[in-house]
Amino acid sequence: KQYSMKKSIIIMVLMAFTNIAIAKTLVTLQQLQGKWQCTEDIYKVNTETWTFKKASFIVENKYVYRDKVDTSKYEIFYYLSKGVPNVYDGSKVGKIGSGTHIIYYAKRRKKILSYEIVSLKGDTLTLSQFAPRAIGRNAGIVTITLKRVSR
C-alpha cells in the first residue's frame, strides 16, 4: 500500500512538471508590440513599463531608493523563437514573426537569456524566466505579469 502511494505521488509530480513545460503560448510580433505595465508592486512606488517594438523592447523603472525617486531605462534587442537556442543569432532580431520565447543577449554576462511566454490573454501578458541566485534571492523561476497600456 505504501509503495503505491509513493508511486502515485511521483506520477502526480511528473504530470505537474509536464503541464508546466507545455504551458507555452505562441505569440506574434504584432501581438507583443505596444506599451505594457508590470502588475506586481514590488516596491511601494515602483512603476515598471515595457515597450515592445519590432526589434527591441525598452524597460523603464521608476522607484524610490533612500527616500529619493530614481529612474532607469534600458533597451534590449530580441527575437522570437519556438524554443531556447544554444547560440544567439542577432540576424533574427525583428525578423521572426512568432514564437514561444523572447530571446536576447545579455552583453555584460555574455550569455543568451530568454523569457518564456506563458500566456497572452486579452491585455494580460505573462512571462517567466529562470533567475540565477542573487543577493537576497535563491535561484528559481520568476513570473512577470504585464497589462497592456497602449498599442
Region spans (language model):
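Positively charged n-region of N-terminal signal peptides that target proteins for export
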Residues: 1-8
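Edge beta-strand at a domain terminus
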Residues: 24, 71-86, 124-151
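Generic beta-strand structural signal
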Residues: 31, 51-54, 80, 96, ...
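Residue-level recognition of conserved beta-strand positions in structured domain cores
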Residues: 61-62, 129
